[in-house]
Amino acid sequence: MTAKKQGAQASASAPSGDSPAERAQWLREELERYSYQYYVLDAPTIPDADYDALFIELQALEAEHPELLTPDSPTQRVGGAPLSAFDSVRHRVPMLSLNNGFEDEDVINFDRRCAQGLGRATAAAPAAFATPAAPADDLFSAADAAEAAANTAGNAVEYACELKFDGLAMSLRYENGTLVQAATRGDGETGEDVTANVRTIKAIPLKLRGTAPSVLEVRGEVFMYRADFDKLNARQAESGEKTFVNPRNAAAGSLRQLDPRITAKRPLSFFAYGVGEMEGFDRPGTHSAMLDGFAKLGLPVCDERRVVRGAQGLLSFHREVGERRDQLPYDIDGVVYKVNAIAEQEQLGFVSRAPRFALAHKFPAQEMTTTVEDIEVQVGRTGAITPVARLAPVFVGGVTVTNATLHNEDEIRRKDVHIGDTVIVRRAGDVIPEVVAVVLERRPADARAFVMPTECPVCGSHVERLEGEAIARCTGGLICAAQRKQALLHFAQRRAMDIEGLGDKVVEQLVDLGIVRTPADLYKLGVAKLAALDRMADKSASNLVAAIEQSRETTMNRFIFALGIRHVGEATAKDLAKHFGKLDNLLAADEAALLEVNDVGPVVAQSIANFIAEPHNVEVIEQLRAAGVHWAETEPTARAPLPLAGKTFVLTGTLPTMSREDAKEKLEAAGAKVAGSVSKKTDYVVAGAEAGSKLEKAQTLGVAVLDEEGMLKLLAEVGAA
């Protein structure tokens, strides 16, 4: 560390005549204090040489007296022995992602939603935002007066604004003030235990200052300053090692080293920005106060933040940060807005695995031109055929891009992309590269138009594109290697063949090891083969074999649903089983016959017909029957008009005597369609206790509202009770 101002010699205030234990404790406290001044306050008070001398003295003392070594000693940051792998960590509070905004309108709509959710009126969005730009030496000095003028009514929502760091999200768990665990975000539910590596990051305190909660889980970002990144790459180049493409990749790669000693040599930093768990301490009333509290505990918190009111304050912050983005000492890809009051955050809650009270406002993506060398297709896990442009390498948005999504065939036609074209490539949201436009004046004479393949490049099955859909799909769902894992998981789910114990991890191993290729292969599995899988004991293997054996006896509608035919859900599977009675009747049906089935329209009929027409799918069905999968069959039933056919219902709230699933079954048995959201096409809303926004929307649209008794009365009136 380089001192900004020289202090007295570090040892001048050391106690004299102290014991080794007292001296070691004093050294630890001094080193942590100097680290706090350097990394948190950005105000070092001693030169590097003095710090190093204290550090070496403590190392020597602990080596001479091993009993004095403590887990939170600064000497423990140097890294221990290499790990064989990272353990998984289940986040007690999920690390959710944020919804993104890219345009000013997205921010205005976000503010409006927050205000409405909190029961506040919102002013009309301003036509322009004329807040003066901040002076070059002060990012936020120009905003306060403009914000006050824009929110004179005092009714606007208050937000905490922060930078969105381009690093790696991290969870730090402190118990009684001591760091006990660090984990990556992972998929939000489960991350990796990187405690040994995080302990080497000098910016992260091993012991919190002052009075800390009994449990505090801090959320933040591990990143690398640009200057540190440049120095690291220079060292890598000098030693003949591979250099990193950008600070984010360097930070992520450094943190995920199995050898903590390598991580210890990498200049990683950290900023705290949120909290997961907190026990033994009252939470502050606002997000901004919580960040202030973090700083008092010795956690690094970015100073580039502000509390504002309303959409204008948010947009002013975004604009000012954007103007200074290139001058900041670290990479950011946007700013983050959070409703400041914690009580209001709780009132707004969450939707679709993201908080309603927060928004990540991304900066405009960077764009570059390159050439399309080829257009290939990729097959997704659900069979979606996605065209991908293979590009001449181009450095854009901080990375070298060689591929870009073209989304679908219509998008290629709309943008008129040809093989050989010069195109503008953008990293949408600074993450996913995409082709934005073609530079037509540079089109070569030998440019070739893209032709969507008629056969799947993975399994050779027919490629279908249903009317009204933009995505083409492989029809070989049961045999296509690209779809194999998803097909098996769907086949085994509770509402299909109900094979308990056949989850993600088991399916992943069975497919990756080549043990299972189609659902029929499941019925060849024995205990020995399953027990050989990772984390699969003999008892678990025996239970899974028993569950597979039990699934041989099923119902025709469950079997049809388990096949994973596109657009065929549980209700349609029941209709097909009831209508045809025997599976062979279904397999022999053409589109005209399928259209005779209740609630089967042209799109569903075409999807079923395409599935049946694929020989590989019929072959797997026969293999399953040969493996002993069976069900009771009946005689076909003629289609009869159902009393509520054509009527759409929506269920909301808690019904007094039945579950919503039971109510749904009754309504569907009478021919009704049960939808998940209210629209002008909704005929009835059945509302129970604590009905929410669906009931409000129904009342706004004038949709008929029934309670459970009213629904049962209606069913009785039409003879469907």
UniProtKB/Swiss-Prot annotation:
Listed SUPFAM superfamilies: BRCT domain (SSF52113), DNA ligase/mRNA capping enzyme, catalytic domain (SSF56091), Nucleic acid-binding proteins (SSF50249), RuvA domain 2-like (SSF47781)
Region of interest (Disordered), ranges: 1-23
Cofactor(s) for this UniProt protein: Mg(2+); Mn(2+)
Reaction(s) catalysed by this chain's protein: NAD(+) + (deoxyribonucleotide)n-3'-hydroxyl + 5'-phospho-(deoxyribonucleotide)m = (deoxyribonucleotide)n+m + AMP + beta-nicotinamide D-nucleotide
Listed Low complexity bias regions: 1-19
Catalytic site: 164 (n6-amp-lysine intermediate)
The protein's Enzyme Commission number: 6.5.1.2
Superkingdom, taxonomy of origin: Bacteria
One GO molecular-function entry: metal ion binding
Keywords: DNA damage, DNA repair, DNA replication, Ligase, Magnesium, Manganese, Metal-binding, NAD, Zinc
Annotated signal sequence range: none
GO annotation, biological process: DNA repair; DNA replication
The keyword Ligase is annotated on this UniProt entry: yes
Family annotation (PROSITE patterns): BRCT, DNA_LIGASE_N1, DNA_LIGASE_N2
BRCT domain residues: 639-721
Entry-linked Gene3D superfamilies: 5' to 3' exonuclease, C-terminal subdomain (1.10.150.20), 6.20.10.30, BRCT domain (3.40.50.10190), DNA ligase/mRNA capping enzyme (3.30.470.30), Helix hairpin bin (1.10.287.610), Nucleic acid-binding proteins (2.40.50.140)
Family: Belongs to the NAD-dependent DNA ligase family. LigA subfamily.
Task performed by this protein: DNA ligase that catalyzes the formation of phosphodiester linkages between 5'-phosphoryl and 3'-hydroxyl groups in double-stranded DNA using NAD as a coenzyme and as the energy source for the reaction. It is essential for DNA replication and repair of damaged DNA.
Protein name: DNA ligase
Name of encoding gene: ligA
